[in-house]
A protein has these predicted regions:
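N-terminal glycine-rich anion-binding loops that anchor highly charged ligand groups
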Residues: 28-42
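Zn2+-dependent cytidine deaminase-like catalytic core
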Residues: 38-137, 222, 248, 255, ...
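Short, flexible segments with low predicted structural confidence
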Residues: 33-34, 93-95, 162
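Generic structural signal for helix capping and beta-alpha/helix-loop junctions
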Residues: 112-113, 139, 305, 327
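Short capping loops/turns at secondary-structure boundaries
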Residues: 111, 115, 131-134, 149-153, ...
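Proteins enriched for Cys/Gly/acidic motifs involved in redox and nucleic-acid/cofactor modification
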Residues: 26-28, 119, 133-161
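Enzymes that bind and transform nitrogen-containing heteroaromatic metabolites
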Residues: 3-31, 47, 87, 155-156, ...
Length: 375
């Protein structure tokens, strides 16, 4: 059995690998974020991370960076090494060829092409394998990837900002700004993190947003607009920039001239059936999953947020709370619609974390599974 000192060293090096993995945020999808650190005789001799989809995996980048021969060394990797050919050859092969004698793994890979096979191959070749080091942190790093690979649908995060009395705007509709600059910058990092960003036509008509990532060297998410009847103006900022920023309109409209107008501007138009008078969000998730969109930041208004909850497509809720009070009986709230009839039928949240960001607070919670049989 390993002593406390060795276990602590394992955690320390895995933490380094996690920090490396996070550098790939926003650029690896539909692949996971992965970091790797190679240690020999108590010294780090190589490190790497998966920088971008299609480029070197973390293990191969770490091996390529080694300052001395890795024979007899240990490699710390946040996710089980792959054992199949994709955009890159199997990392298991590279590890075996390198002479590394010990592999320390954070998360097992749920991908059915890997799922325990990489670990088994390593063990069959006499490699010492230690599993589940900082497993919780490594799992959380790739929660969107894990959900997508198991369900073939995007991992959906509902995000909204509100005052302490639960308002997302004043009674006049003014909403700039509910939260402070630090919280708004945090939102930009979320836009980088997730592959897509989704809003409803109501938000587009009210705010004419861009829904882009404003971080330096950031990557714009794929913009997804739920617009049943294609009411978004062709001179809106989203449509006018669709030729340079990937933009999808989900609609049930059969008006071929309207559809052509959007497509001529560079938009992709998805034909999605209606359900209860709105876009069928479950069908939309299937279509987006097939298009390799593995995660979505939902920045909808109250109507779309309600539809998303009612449809059971939301896995996480991010609530930014500003220390302000707007009041107003008619001031909008984050989730509207008809609502649930009683407390027993409410959507339940779990594993809530509270983070202070400047003067504001972020409460991040997971949606508890199977509350309504479809969440």
């Amino acid at each position: 059995m390993k002593d406390i000192t060795d276990m602590e060293k394992d955690r320390q090096y895995m933490k380094m690998a996690l920090e490396l993995a996070q550098k790939g945020m926003g650029f690896t999808a539909p692949n996971p974020m992965v970091g790797a650190v190679i240690v020999k005789s108590g010294k780090v001799i190589g490190q790497g991370y998966h920088r971008k989809y299609g480029e070197l995996h973390a293990e191969r980048e770490a091996l390529a960076s080694c300052t001395e021969q890795p024979e007899g060394a240990s490699i710390y990797v946040t996710l089980e090494p792959c054992c199949h050919y994709g955009k890159q050859p199997p990392c298991v092969n590279a590890i075996l060829e390198s002479g590394i004698r010990r592999v320390i793994i954070g998360s097992s890979d749920p991908n059915p092409l890997v799922s325990g096979k990489g670990i088994r191959i390593l063990k069959e070749h006499g490699i010492e394998v230690t599993e589940n080091v900082l497993k919780e942190e490594c799992d959380k790093l790739n929660e969107a990837f894990f959900y997508y690979i198991q369900n073939q649908k995007p991992y959906v995060v509902m995000k909204y900002a509100m005052t302490m009395d639960g308002k997302i705007a004043t009674y006049t509709g003014a909403s700039r700004w509910v939260t402070g600059e630090a919280a708004r910058m945090h939102v930009q990092k979320q836009r980088l993190k997730y592959t897509g960003i989704m809003a409803g036509v109501g938000t587009v008509l009210a705010d004419d947003p861009m829904l882009t990532c404003r971080l330096e060297n950031g990557r714009n998410p794929v913009r997804i607009i739920c617009d049943s009847h294609l009411r978004t103006p062709l001179n809106s900022r989203i449509v006018k920039t669709a030729s340079t920023i990937p933009t999808i309109f989900a609609t049930s409209s059969k008006d071929q001239q309207k559809i052509k107008n959007y497509e001529d501007m560079g938009c992709k138009v998805l034909d999605v059936p209606e359900k209860n008078g709105h876009i069928d969000l479950n069908r939309l998730m299937e279509l987006l999953g097939a298009a390799k969109i593995d995660s979505i930041l939902l920045e909808g208004g109250g109507t779309l947020n309600w539809s998303a909850l009612e449809s059971g497509i939301v896995q996480k809720v991010q609530t930014y709370i500003a220390p302000k009070l707007f009041g107003g009986e008619s001031a909008k709230t984050p989730i509207e619609g008809k609502g649930f009839p009683d407390p027993a039928s409410a959507v339940l949240l779990k594993n809530s974390e509270i983070i202070r960001i400047g003067d504001d607070f972020l409460i991040e919670s997971e949606v508890k599974s199977n509350v309504h049989g479809n969440c």
